[in-house]
Amino acid sequence: MSNKPIADMIETIEHFAQTQPSYPVYNVLGQEHTYGDLKSDSDSLAAVIDQLGLPEKSPVVVFGGQEYEMLATFVALTKSGHAYIPIDSHSALERVSAILEVAEPSLIIAISAFPLEQVSTPMINLAQVQEAFAQGNNYEITHPVKGDDNYYIIFTSGTTGQPKGVQISHDNLLSFTNWMITDKEFATPSRPQMLAQPPYSFDLSVMYWAPTLALGGTLFTLPSVITQDFKQLFAAIFSLPIAIWTSTPSFADMAMLSEYFNSEKMPGITHFYFDGEELTVKTAQKLRERFPNARIINAYGPTEATVALSAVAVTDEMLATLKRLPIGYTKADSPTFIIDEEGNKLPNGEQGEIIVSGPAVSKGYMNNPEKTAEAFFEFEDLPAYHTGDVGTMTDEGLLLYGGRMDFQIKFNGYRIELEDVSQNLNKSRFIESAVAVPRYNKDHKVQNLLAYVILKDSVREQFERDIDITKAIKEDLTDIMMSYMIPSKFLYRDSLPLTPNGKIDIKGLINEVNKR
């Protein structure tokens, strides 16, 4: 039986609270909370929020990790007509402070201890939230988030300058959710059993909670005490009865460091959903070997177009024949085009910037008209967004990714795509993972290319010195890379830094190399 689109997120959650009140919606390391719990707790908290007399539709910050109280608070805020701004409890203080400055929230709900002192914004803590749950207040839903009202606001993790708050409306959310639960590429089962690992402050989280709540499924998550310790994390993850794994490819790469991450130990896994960064052929091949019968979905899209705008199930033929995986068939309701520098549409097969239009495109950045005007525009009478990504559309309607426009550099007259260099580095038999980073001179021209490298196990035992390893890697690469693309310096590391969202922190490495 195929899934049906939903008309309203809160009405759908209410429906499941009536039809399956004792079915688990949230499981934190074996501790279950049901759809009935979610309804009564969110109703009771919504009643308390209404009594605070906050300005109508004003945004509210919710600070915490993956606790059940986070989800119940989000639902309560939606019922009471407020957009929520999730901030992860591991966020840097400067980031938390910058978000408060931009967002000017009417309230902070701190599920985890709030790290900033002397905040003028009113605050509710975890004990008060739990006390509100215990009151068991009834609640009549008369002024929920609807239509073009903001449902959530997610701040992108810019490494420089002020973070930008992407406003996602209820209509935006429905466009994404209904595509995901009805799309043949995702093939999302009813009552999905989903891993809820990416933090709520990262819009990849919407890829697990939206379809799960829309289809009456269960979210499985882990307390932050465990997620901070990789050994504990993977010992716990392997015991979860999940069917769908949603994460960045980097997180799956980390999981594959464990020999237990395979279909024998985790026989329940039927789907992998990837988004947030590029899924390489190498990672997908390794995953296919570990989980030969699982469906691997490569999805793509910016936060500004509500999580994702395209998706494709990776086939064995793709893995055998392609150097770079396609990023998917685009959503039917979201016309996606390739344009040139003058803004003209390009024919299939030609490379340009990917722009997306339609009902999933955000209304813009919160309280930031300047940045909104730079990135958002109207295209053929539809709201549209400049992704800043390079791409090509095939005649079959598949979108191909060509890297970030801001990760394209000019070196010795050649235009070089940093992600191309990184992908080729990863083909070396000596390399487990690598990224290419430019070093600039004082005139901001690229002086040379560096590579940060994690070596495969036992490589060091084969060579006496790092210089010998570098020589062997360069010999490995001469057949597959132009000489001007091969980095001149190789820096060997045990690990590469990740952003709070689980992506390799390329911008951070660029800043490190250039001592910014």
From Swiss-Prot:
Pfam families: AMP-binding (PF00501), AMP-binding_C (PF13193). It is an enzyme of class 6 (ligase). GO terms for cellular component: cytoplasm. The keyword Signal does not apply. ATP binds at T156, S157, N298, A299, Y300, G301, P302, T303, D389, Y401, G402, G403, R404, K503. One of its GO terms (molecular function) is ATP binding. Its EC number is 6.2.1.54. Keywords: ATP-binding, Cytoplasm, Ligase, Nucleotide-binding. It is found in: Cytoplasm. Coiled coil: none annotated. The keyword ATP-binding applies. InterPro entries: AA_adenyl_dom, AMP-bd_C, AMP-bd_C_sf, AMP-binding_CS, AMP-dep_synth/lig_dom, ANL_N_sf, DltA, DltA-like. Pathway: Cell wall biogenesis; lipoteichoic acid biosynthesis. One of its GO terms (biological process) is lipoteichoic acid biosynthetic process. D-alanine binds at D203, V307, K503. It comes from the Bacteria. It catalyses: holo-[D-alanyl-carrier protein] + D-alanine + ATP = D-alanyl-[D-alanyl-carrier protein] + AMP + diphosphate. Belongs to the ATP-dependent AMP-binding enzyme family. DltA subfamily. HAMAP family: DltA. Catalyzes the first step in the D-alanylation of lipoteichoic acid (LTA), the activation of D-alanine and its transfer onto the D-alanyl carrier protein (Dcp) DltC. In an ATP-dependent two-step reaction, forms a high energy D-alanyl-AMP intermediate, followed by transfer of the D-alanyl residue as a thiol ester to the phosphopantheinyl prosthetic group of the Dcp. D-alanylation of LTA plays an important role in modulating the properties of the cell wall in Gram-positive bacteria, influencing the net charge of the cell wall. This is D-alanine--D-alanyl carrier protein ligase. It comes from Streptococcus pneumoniae (strain 70585).
